[in-house]
Amino acid sequence: MSHPDYRMNLRPLGTPRGVSAVAGPHDIGASPGDKKSKNRSTRGKKKSIFETYMSKEDVSEGLKRGTLIQGVLRINPKKFHEAFIPSPDGDRDIFIDGVVARNRALNGDLVVVKLLPEEHWKVVKPESNDKETEAAYESDIPEELCGHHLPQQSLKSYNDSPDVIVEAQFDGSDSEDGHGITQNVLVDGVKKLSVCVSEKGREDGDAPVTKDETTCISQDTRALSEKSLQRSAKVVYILEKKHSRAATGFLKLLADKNSELFRKYALFSPSDHRVPRIYVPLKDCPQDFVARPKDYANTLFICRIVDWKEDCNFALGQLAKSLGQAGEIEPETEGILTEYGVDFSDFSSEVLECLPQGLPWTIPPEEFSKRRDLRKDCIFTIDPSTARDLDDALSCKPLADGNFKVGVHIADVSYFVPEGSDLDKVAAERATSVYLVQKVVPMLPRLLCEELCSLNPMSDKLTFSVIWTLTPEGKILDEWFGRTIIRSCTKLSYEHAQSMIESPTEKIPAKELPPISPEHSSEEVHQAVLNLHGIAKQLRQQRFVDGALRLDQLKLAFTLDHETGLPQGCHIYEYRESNKLVEEFMLLANMAVAHKIHRAFPEQALLRRHPPPQTRMLSDLVEFCDQMGLPVDFSSAGALNKSLTQTFGDDKYSLARKEVLTNMCSRPMQMALYFCSGLLQDPAQFRHYALNVPLYTHFTSPIRRFADVLVHRLLAAALGYRERLDMAPDTLQKQADHCNDRRMASKRVQELSTSLFFAVLVKESGPLESEAMVMGILKQAFDVLVLRYGVQKRIYCNALALRSHHFQKVGKKPELTLVWEPEDMEQEPAQQVITIFSLVEVVLQAESTALKYSAILKRPGTQGHLGPEKEEEESDGEPEDSSTS
């Protein structure tokens, strides 16, 4: 599905309604000030800059014959002239060099490419790092791999759902740091890991980078090893424009005031350098922009690309909206949402009419005859203390034989979302709720999210349940699926559940607990939590024995000022036993439902698969670990997990090194994907790599994920509650693809929201000090993981008070020797050696440019207290959807 045009009704600035700003002048293909354009011959058509796209028929035939290749385009955020698509065989990505070869495709588009002749392939020098490939990857690691959620101030996150925890991803592109690195040099073949990168000075800032690390082939290709060549291609067709064609950025006047273009157009410069510069009609711009352009130098605008012709070097756009001042949270947030195609408009009256109208709503009497009545059972929710959309509840009843009746009860959202209704259509299009640090953009109207569907305590609710008979060791003796009615007896927070786990024999004072319904006691709830915890520990242990993988990464939680909304502080979120308890049972329910719907509908089940790591990147990581002397086994997910959990000690240095290696291990990981079982022939492709299970799906978060709503419908059909789902396998696959796209966009938006708030925090509360560990060494800089805040930064030697610095290799390991200028004449210059995994102390400080901050290495001998102690208050978020899962 392509992006909806729900925001196109934003009125272009200065343009009356009904006046189109799409049509452009005949000379718009000329660069500003291009004098030749004024004297262009009129005898023929203007020369094209871009190739004409191939016909659909030729593309289809070429894909069938294998002469063309399709893939999702990734543009390097650090070097916008470099782009890639994945190689179908998992080998090195296919390289697309330059804007012309990209042929007007934008980041994220599904494109078709044609390989260039071999003499035009990219030559990767033996010392080349290939880090550009890595940098082009963006947010495609599944949440199932990570147990840490991305906590919010007061919201239960889409990625915080307890069944998604394992999937949290890592963005290896260091997107905050846009400095042009002109040369990447590998130390003895260690690729993609920033071990050693030769860079030309930072003085050029964002100046265009050179490409001296690679060249086109100018010699007999037979003399080159296969490893030194990277296949290169050009885009010949765009199968699907997945990029929103919207961007935030700044308005500028064209350079040549005497040109014809100057009198008609302004230049829009996107903040994201992967988006081309755009000509904008002056009639779209503020009326006084030409006379007072400096007044708008710091104003953020939204612009939409409306056309990009073959003979135009820049796209033509329409200015949609003025957002406000750059660097302020709300304008920046709206820009992020718009760029990633998030529909944040109010729900239409047609959608709202689909909701129950007579409020307060009560369960119709006939539902009691169709469902199992569990209202007398001790059922409760465990969520962040401020969560409002409670879509999962748990129960645990001891049996006389020593076993337990354990239930996972999920809000029956599908009851309130009629298939084919306007509500269903908008939910399918949005596909996911989008969670920002300060707010949520819901998939469904709040009446459903927070009231009718939310499993609020002491209120009758419609649910879909999975109930097992389990031994204390977690062995499944019996399993039941069905529609139910529950009445949650209390709303526990993770803190409440954690205190119960930590005090198994002590009674928790009533004043420290939330209200509990009179039918149940705090002791009963406490014992149920302890029983669930005991079983969850056994389930978890067995999962890892069976070969599951977990890559826990540092995640930030913010404390916000209630009046201003600005961040007051932040801390690394601690993922505790109460989080793990919920995660295990959500995983168990998702796996159980996956098997149930696949047995019932082997050709129509909506499942979730996780492909194994990318072969090329994984082999590079293996090589890196070997050279660094790290005994890490990458032969399987379970082997890797065992290496990460058993290789490192518990001292500060070992824990920091584990964090760095976890980041590196995340990079080769691929995205977990929804898919229709009938369209994959090989059942081996159904597998979930991180969980190491044959079948998996998402069932436990229907309030915030449309995929779960579809799975609920499939489960209902499998149980005979309704007719079979009226969706052909290819239609279901299209919806699955759309859910994948929107899920990725949502995760990227969440990351950018976190980055935005952290940048504001550095500006408002900085400088911030922290210990950091070196991840990679370059000739004139090095990369660090800032341990207190979980961010990665590059530290440049020429930004430090150094007398000199020297790069060298010791064996196969790179190192930088820094010679510091003495602070007074009587001191000798201090020498500091930087190696991979060095622990250093850094200062994060704001730069003059909005939302930019840099990392500065502290001078040796000045290390002291590293800033404020970690805040003790727990995150308001929930684990990252163990649904990886």
UniProtKB/Swiss-Prot annotation:
Gene3D superfamilies: 2.40.50.690, 2.40.50.700, Nucleic acid-binding proteins
GO CC term (a single one): P-body
Residue positions, PTM Phosphoserine: S31, S173, S875
Residues annotated as transmembrane: none
Impact upon substituting D391N: Loss of exoribonuclease activity
GO BP term, pick one: miRNA catabolic process
Keyword terms, alphabetized: Acetylation, Cell cycle, Cell division, Cytoplasm, Disease variant, Exonuclease, Hydrolase, Magnesium, Metal-binding, Mitosis, Nuclease, Phosphoprotein, RNA-binding, Tumor suppressor
Cofactor(s) demanded: Mg(2+); Mn(2+)
Highest rank taxon of the organism: Eukaryota
E.C. code: 3.1.13.-
Residue ranges with Acidic residues bias: 870-885
Residues the entry annotates as binding Mg(2+): D383, D392
Location, primary (coarse class): cytoplasm
Oligomeric and partner information: Interacts with XRN1.
Protein name (database record): DIS3-like exonuclease 2
Organism: Homo sapiens (Human)
